[in-house]
């Protein structure tokens, strides 16, 4: 029976990855940060099912506490480590560049150093990001493409990406980078543009919201389903030798296209409900990202299973159900409607 250690287990990717590993018979350990409120809502169903069997074990820890990370890894002695923890909002990284950079750089380095000192047989996955490329040219990006980060978040990811390669080359660690392009799901955070759109569709459809304000509608992204992408993470650590892989769909769509499909799914014209505001534009906008997953397909046997339209519809369906529950509470006088998305 294999053991996995996941940082960022309470996030979108943490949910899908831990679900996958638990279904494969793994014992899964995950880190959560101490706070005044418990934030495990995404994985509550997994906790209910697997924690009583001691197959899902959560630990309080902070990636910036290198001693704590070393002690935890040395105690667990996992077969695989997946580093998913990060301050992952690009726009927030401009507002909090120091915290974003510390988490993204020192966190990954603490884990790599713990593996080097504790057990070099542990396999390590680092969550790299397509934001590292910068989106300067409208071309398909692969593992050899030039990195040109445009945000503090992207810069921190470049550091972790290169450090993962340094430890692989210098200490013969099984350390891999998964360069994941944008991946979404019903579990996506509500401040990300895709989820902001689908949540608004559900609320507008049920009469709880009137307008949706967005930023750059022309920004193009290669959007895939998070469940497909976390399967690729696992596949990377099952190979005979470590390597880096781009995980993407190979097609790109604009924010406007996403909104159009989301609203049309419920029979609405998006142009009647969407407005733009400059305050939602990023200081150094990445306009275009498109990935080439040929290497992953050839060496891992991986390819995306979920189409763009299936992804949009899946997210809208989920948020329609969420809005329906919210409507019931509103009708019972337990909630007030929000006529526009919160800023």
For each predicted feature, which ranges?
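N-terminal Rossmann-like NAD(P)+-binding domain of SDR-like oxidoreductases, especially those catalyzing
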Residues: 1-183, 237, 265, 306, ...
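C-terminal substrate-binding subdomain of Rossmann-fold SDR/epimerase-dehydratase oxidoreductases
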Residues: 23, 30-31, 38, 61-64, ...
């Amino acid at each position: 029976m294999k053991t996995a250690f996941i940082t960022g287990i309470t996030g979108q990717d943490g949910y899908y990855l831990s679900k996958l590993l638990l279904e494969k018979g793994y014992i899964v350990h995950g880190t959560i940060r101490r706070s005044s409120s418990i934030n495990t809502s995404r994985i509550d169903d997994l906790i209910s099912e697997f924690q009583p069997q001691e197959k899902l074990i959560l630990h309080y820890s902070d990636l910036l506490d290198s001693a704590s990370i070393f002690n935890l890894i040395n105690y667990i002695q996992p077969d695989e480590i997946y580093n998913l923890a990060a301050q992952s909002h690009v726009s927030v990284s401009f507002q909090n560049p120091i915290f974003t950079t510390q988490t993204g750089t020192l966190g990954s380095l603490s884990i790599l150093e713990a593996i080097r000192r504790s057990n070099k047989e542990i396999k390590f996955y680092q969550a790299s990001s397509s934001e590292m490329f910068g989106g300067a040219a409208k071309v398909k990006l692969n593992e050899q493409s030039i990195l040109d980060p445009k945000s503090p978040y992207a810069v921190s990811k470049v550091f972790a990406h290169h450090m993962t390669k340094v430890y692989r080359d210098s200490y013969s660690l099984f350390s891999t980078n998964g360069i994941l392009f944008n991946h979404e799901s019903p579990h996506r955070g509500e401040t990300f543009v895709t989820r902001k759109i689908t949540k608004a569709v559900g609320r507008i459809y049920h009469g709880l919201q009137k307008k949706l304000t967005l930023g750059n509608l022309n920004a193009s992204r290669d959007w895939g389903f998070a469940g497909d992408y976390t399967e690729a993470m696992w596949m990377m650590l099952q190979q005979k030798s470590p390597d880096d892989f781009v995980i993407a769909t190979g097609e790109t769509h604009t924010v406007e296209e996403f909104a159009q499909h989301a609203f049309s799914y419920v029979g609405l014209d998006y142009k009647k409900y969407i407005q733009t505001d400059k305050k939602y534009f990023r200081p150094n906008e990445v306009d275009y990202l498109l990935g080439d997953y040929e290497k992953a397909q050839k060496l891992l046997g991986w390819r995306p299973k979920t189409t763009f339209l299936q992804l949009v519809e899946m997210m809208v369906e989920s948020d329609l159900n969420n809005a329906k529950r919210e409507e019931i509470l509103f009708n019972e006088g337990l909630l007030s409607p929000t006529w526009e998305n919160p800023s």
